[in-house]
From Swiss-Prot:
The lineage of its organism: Bacteria, Pseudomonadati, Pseudomonadota, Betaproteobacteria, Nitrosomonadales. Belongs to the ATPase alpha/beta chains family. Residues 11-24 have a biased composition (Polar residues). HAMAP family: ATP_synth_beta_bact. Its EC number is 7.1.2.2. It is found in: Cell inner membrane. Produces ATP from ADP in the presence of a proton gradient across the membrane. The catalytic sites are hosted primarily by the beta subunits. It is a peripheral membrane protein. PROSITE patterns: ATPASE_ALPHA_BETA. F-type ATPases have 2 components, CF(1) - the catalytic core - and CF(0) - the membrane proton channel. CF(1) has five subunits: alpha(3), beta(3), gamma(1), delta(1), epsilon(1). CF(0) has three main subunits: a(1), b(2) and c(9-12). The alpha and beta chains form an alternating ring which encloses part of the gamma chain. CF(1) is attached to CF(0) by a central stalk formed by the gamma and epsilon chains, while a peripheral stalk is formed by the delta and b chains. This is ATP synthase subunit beta 2. It catalyses: ATP + H2O + 4 H(+)(in) = ADP + phosphate + 5 H(+)(out).
Length: 485
């Protein structure tokens, strides 16, 4: 029996190693590590008693087909597991088999073009990816001296984002918004516009969203011709909280392999990172931990950091991530939103007011920010135009009350010009999306930064406007005839 102990020790050690060859042997050797018995079942939480070879935290164990992850060690021999598949048919005393390793997922070229679940298993109806290497989904973030900061921009072709909240190549960008303000449409548009022009690979990770959206995305990726250099991972809202909590880590493990072992640039899109926090809170509740601020788990900050700190650029390659963030009840002071915000280099805030006025994408020009918006990175002209656009829109915001009470006529000529410019800018910053063609009926447009700057500059310089505001609504670049009069 001591031989078994040594073996399990060896397997656990190699499962945590980053050497691919060592890891390869894990799958083979992990067949006979420890046997336990189901002691207690409470919802998705299962207590298992092991007499020997007690599994460690994060180890994967199986009761028949039911996969569980060890979340806590209760006392000598008893471990508390979180079920990753429905607990249907599970009974007390049933045998539990420990694999001696955490979840291992296939990595490398073999996963490209595939739609997979948290275990790296196919959900696209095709055979399992033919990968030679698999890795544990629990990895440490790169050490500080390995990390690098880029100061280049990822052009998205979306006017409001490129102008006011430029996305950092190799950085993290959040798309914040309450329910139904257009986060999913925007992230799909970003895939459309950036994945095609992106030289490396793209990963899309769906966490806790609707399965219908996953299906639509799969189809759209095929139409855009980017599917063969994209991996899609899903832990949707119908799945167990443990799955929604871990699927982001599966995505990152694959992204890290492309970055570190293949030296590629990775575009990582996550919809929706709030659902990761929410799943963590559900797991925490199942484990019986006391809730903390606003009912969230006490481990909110560390859990989020364990995911976000891995999304980083190193000397070997960059991971550029764009994450949709659901903001509960439109409350931006919500602890989950506030914590996510602190990890990002750019945040695009979507406003309900703009969405209700039909100003899509509903980017709030005053609340959206980016550390890239400095003269040193974007250039003096871009910086000055962005500042002037913000100032004009802020002045218009201040004038709105007066206009509502006294009417536009009561404003001074200078203020009237500000209002005319601001209303045209607001409309010019809307844009028809390729991903919204089916419900908006408008043909999508991609606009270069140069065209966006030229358009805004022209509006800012105009003093008399002979045209209609509506001419600026849902267009791409400003056409030539719209010159100053
Ligand atoms: N760019 C756009 N152009 C036209 N309509 C849009 C656009 N973006 C969003 N919409 C409208 O808003 C609706 C909701 O968008 P979306 O599903 O992206 O919101 P969401 O913020 O992801 O919502 P949820 O939080 O429910 O997932 C769309 O179905 C569409 O009617």
């Amino acid at each position: 029996m001591s031989g078994m102990g040594e073996k399990s020790e060896q397997i656990s050690k190699s499962a945590r190693s980053t050497d691919p060859q060592e890891q390869e042997s894990v799958a083979l050797a992990s067949q006979c590590v420890g046997e336990g018995r189901v002691l207690k079942i409470r919802g998705g939480v299962v207590d298992v008693f092991f007499t020997e070879h007690i599994p460690r935290i994060h180890d994967l164990v199986y009761a028949g087909d039911l996969a569980m992850e060890v979340a806590a060690l209760l006392d000598q021999g008893t471990v508390r597991c979180i079920a990753l598949t429905p607990v249907r048919g599970l009974g007390l005393g049933m045998p539990v088999h420990a694999t001696g390793a955490p979840i291992q997922v296939p990595v490398g070229e073999a996963v490209l073009g595939r739609m997979l679940n948290v275990f790296g298993e196919p959900i696209d109806g095709k055979p399992a990816p033919n990968a030679t290497i698999s890795r544990s989904i629990h990895q440490a973030p790169p050490v500080l001296e390995e990390r690098v900061v880029h100061s280049t921009i990822l052009e998205t072709g979306i006017k409001a984002i490129d102008l006011l909240s430029p996305i950092e190549r190799g950085g993290k960008t959040g798309l914040f918004g309450g329910a139904g303000v257009g986060k999913t449409v925007l992230i799909t548009e970003l895939i459309n516009n950036t994945a095609q022009h992106h030289k490396g690979v793209s990963l899309f990770c769906g966490i806790g969203e609707r399965s219908r959206e996953a299906e639509e995305l799969y189809r759209e990726m095929g139409e855009a011709g980017v599917r063969d250099k994209t991996v899609m991972l899903f832990g949707q809202m119908s799945e167990a909280p443990g799955v929604r909590f871990l699927v982001g880590k599966t995505a990152l493990t694959m992204a890290e392999y492309f970055r570190d072992d293949l030296g590629q640039d990775v575009l990582l899109l996550i919809d929706n990172v709030f659902r990761f926090v929410q799943a963590g809170s559900e797991v925490s509740g199942l484990l019986g931990r006391m809730p903390s601020r606003v009912g969230y788990q006490p481990t909110l900050a560390t859990e989020l950091a364990s995911l976000q700190e891995r999304i980083t650029s190193t000397r070997k390659g960059a991971i550029t991530s764009i994450q949709a963030v659901y903001v509960p009840a439109d409350d931006f002071t919500d602890p989950a939103a506030a914590h996510i915000f602190s990890h990002l280099s750019a945040s695009v805030v979507l406003s309900r007011k703009r969405a209700s006025e039909g100003l899509y994408p509903a980017v709030d020009p005053l609340a959206s920010t980016s550390v890239m918006l400095t003269p040193a990175v974007v250039g003096q002209r871009h910086y000055d135009i962005a500042r002037a656009v913000r100032r004009t829109l802020a002045e218009y915001e201040e004038l709105r009350d007066i206009i509502a009470m006294l009417g536009l006529e009561e404003l001074s000529a200078a203020d009237r010009t500000v209002v005319a410019r601001a209303r045209r800018l607001e409309r010019f910053l809307t844009q028809p999306f390729f991903s919204a063609e089916s419900f908006s009926g408008e043909i999508g447009a991609r606009v270069s930064v140069a065209e966006t700057l030229a358009g805004c500059e022209r509006i800012l310089q105009q003093t008399k406007f002979a045209d209609d505001e509506i001419d600026y609504y849902m267009i791409g670049a400003l056409p030539e005839q719209k010159t100053a009069v």
